[in-house]
Amino acid sequence: PLSTWGAYIIGTMGGLFEDEGYALHSGFSGFLAAVPFQFYPMTALIMVLLTVLYRRHIGSMRHYEAYTDEDDSKLEALEEEMPEERETGVSHWALIVTVLSLVVMTLFMMVWNAGFNLGEVLNQDITVPLFFGGLTAFIVALGFAFTARNVHLGEIFKTAALGIGAMAKSAVLILVLAWMVSGAIQDLDAGSHIADAIESVNFSTTVIPVVMFLVAGGMAFATGTSWGAFGILLPIAVPLAVSTDPTMMPVLIAAVLGGAVFGDHSSPVSDTTVLSATGAGAKLHAHFISQLPYALISALIAALAYLVYGLSGMLLLAYAVMAIGLFLYVKLTKAHAA
């Protein structure tokens, strides 16, 4: 929750809960309640660990791994292209202290806003505390930058301006558009209309979680952003849960969030895909093709888990499905020789 991503989701959920008269959760507590149902992120993280431990390289990734193993000069060429590191005299503790300042200040401001009443902390709007936490971390980072060697003052502010500009051109614009769409959807009362349609055709509510997961994934894949999927589908998922089964609220929220993250991970036009490829020094197409099978397998396992939970209402059974799916992933794929 201590991120712009978390703040946006929590703020959106809080407003939707208030509009729908849903009093079981605040935006923050609703966000936390959805964590146990985040089947896709859990599966993806565990799959990363299993892939590393058991060297499960599938699809084009197997080809790229074999290619670099056969010719180490390819890796050496990449290393030569990397920019030369400069000795700045700044300890690695600078990063740790900066991150800690963000967390500590954010938590302090949450407690402050709650009047030091710990029981009310989860009901607070995290947006303002997160702003002060980010501002504090920025000031701390500037302090470390000023003490660094071989780093000029103009370079520091140029880097800060580039970071602000990148956010303004991408994340801020996406947020504004998402809020516009979200407001339009609420004015149209789309969630209630969908709920009425489900009831009129006797559509089983047990499959709603997996449907929301797949729709969010497809939407984020097509648009290249999870933020837009959040803004469009959360205003549908919340009133849908209120109208059909309020106890399904956490799992529906998790399905939307997890599906949007899956689509964002998989999309060739996603900023995360571009940044990952750039950071790894890989071509965008090669990165997209090589990571897609892993994301699809994780999404398939997560979809089955949502389906099983919707049919049974048992979280442990959904976890069992995830465990079986990951076990089959390891058993049915071949290890890549070291």
Model-derived features: positions:
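Alpha-helical transmembrane segments
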Residues: 33-51, 125-138, 249-264
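Membrane-interfacial loop-to-helix junctions in multi-pass transporters
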Residues: 37-39, 92, 130-131, 164-172, ...
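Hydrophobic alpha-helical transmembrane segments of multi-pass integral membrane proteins
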Residues: 172-178, 202-240, 244, 249, ...
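Hydrophobic transmembrane alpha-helices of multi-pass small-molecule transporters
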Residues: 39-41, 52-53, 69-180, 297-338
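Transmembrane helix boundary and interhelical junction motifs in multipass membrane proteins
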Residues: 1-9, 224-236, 268-272
